[in-house]
């Protein structure tokens, strides 16, 4: 018997990932297209719709062969309306994008839209490192800090689906670094990979990205090791506060740097457990996310299936 198939779309700030995902969470085929190819002269949603239509046609599928469309999208997403209501970066023509309405019109199928970090968390819950867990915090470290929170088996979304913006938890509110959101002291200004790179470049302009920084750390560079120690302190302090609020079983850390077990994951785990009250540390697991680049697509389909159980 043929499995149900869904179109998954993961909209990022520089590219859109497209995939056909089945009812088991398997990604059957996928592709990626730039959304910034002309400096955003073409609105992101226009590029996404064109790429999605071409992708489905390239697979020899008609919309009738698909159950629905699940979208994971960067930015502040009103998941009830399926629209973009805010961003913390410079993405021209993106705020106000009616993602749900445009894709429903294009394919004649039901569409759900959720924040990308929420989708990462849901993907891990469905078929990844959080399978079988009911209380999970998922954090992605990259240009910013994204977050998804599962509590009692349900995604915490809030009134409009905007909940879980962990990166804008104001850890240094009184004397903090200005943030792209307009506030100051937001956690992502200290915990994002870009925060580590900024600090490293003040020491050596050659350390231009996470890869170069971790290579220097693995070679035993004491300056970089000290920077990493401070950076993981900042990450751990933010997570410790969240542990006291949400009492998770599991914290998953995603993003390109999450492959660094000894230099990143292990120190964060040790520091978080040392920073929380003992009862909160009991049984708490902290580890790297498993699904990597597919997490957003897989989570978008899980979100769709949760929203449309009849399909």
Model-derived segments and spans:
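Glycine-rich phosphate-binding/hydrolytic loop that grips phosphoryl groups
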Residues: 21, 112-125, 259-311
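Short helix-capping segments at alpha-helix termini
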Residues: 59-63, 106-107, 205, 274-281
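Glycine-rich phosphate-binding loop and adjoining helix at the ATP-binding site
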Residues: 41-49, 65-69, 75-135, 263-275
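Glycine/GP-enriched mid-protein hinge/lid loop-to-helix segment characteristic of carbohydrate kinases
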Residues: 2-7, 19-21, 29-32, 36-41, ...
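Conserved phosphate-binding loops in N-terminal lobes of ATP-dependent enzymes
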Residues: 3, 7-11, 15-73
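Hydrophobic "anchor" residues
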Residues: 27, 77, 84, 155-156
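Adenine-nucleotide phosphate-binding core of ATP-dependent small-molecule kinases
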Residues: 37-62, 187-189, 195-252, 257-266, ...
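Short glycine-rich anion-binding loops that position phosphate/pyrophosphate groups of nucleotides
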Residues: 14, 74-77, 142-144, 257
């Amino acid at each position: 018997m043929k499995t149900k198939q869904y179109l998954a779309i993961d909209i990022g700030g520089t590219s859109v990932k497209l995939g056909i995902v089945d009812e088991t969470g398997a990604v059957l085929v996928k592709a990626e297209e730039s959304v910034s190819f002309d400096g955003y002269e073409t609105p992101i949603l226009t590029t996404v719709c064109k790429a999605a239509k071409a992708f489905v046609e390239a697979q020899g599928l008609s919309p009738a062969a698909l159950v629905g469309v699940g979208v994971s999208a960067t930015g502040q997403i009103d998941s009830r309306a399926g629209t973009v209501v805010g961003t913390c970066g410079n993405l021209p023509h993106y705020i106000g994008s009616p993602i749900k309405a445009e894709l429903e019109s294009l394919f004649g199928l039901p569409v759900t839209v959720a924040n990308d970090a929420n989708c990462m968390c849901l993907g891990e819950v469905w078929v990844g490192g959080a399978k079988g867990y009911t209380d999970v915090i998922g954090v992605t470290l990259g240009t910013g800090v994204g977050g998804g929170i599962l509590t009692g088996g349900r995604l915490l979304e809030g009134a409009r689906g905007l909940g879980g913006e962990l990166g804008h938890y104001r850890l240094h509110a009184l004397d903090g670094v200005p943030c792209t959101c307009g506030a100051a002291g937001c956690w992502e200004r200290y915990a994002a990979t870009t925060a580590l790179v900024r600090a490293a470049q003040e020491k050596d302009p050659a350390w231009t990205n996470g890869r170069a920084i971790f290579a220097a750390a693995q070679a035993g560079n004491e300056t970089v090791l000290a920077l990493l120690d401070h950076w993981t302190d900042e990450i751990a302090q933010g997570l410790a506060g969240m542990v006291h609020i949400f009492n998770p079983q599991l914290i998953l850390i995603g993003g390109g740097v999450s492959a660094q077990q000894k230099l990143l994951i292990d120190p964060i785990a040790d520091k978080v457990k040392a920073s929380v009250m003992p009862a909160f540390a009991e049984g708490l697991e902290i580890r790297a996310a498993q699904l990597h680049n597919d997490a957003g697509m897989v989570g978008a389909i899980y979100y769709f299936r949760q929203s449309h159980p009849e399909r």
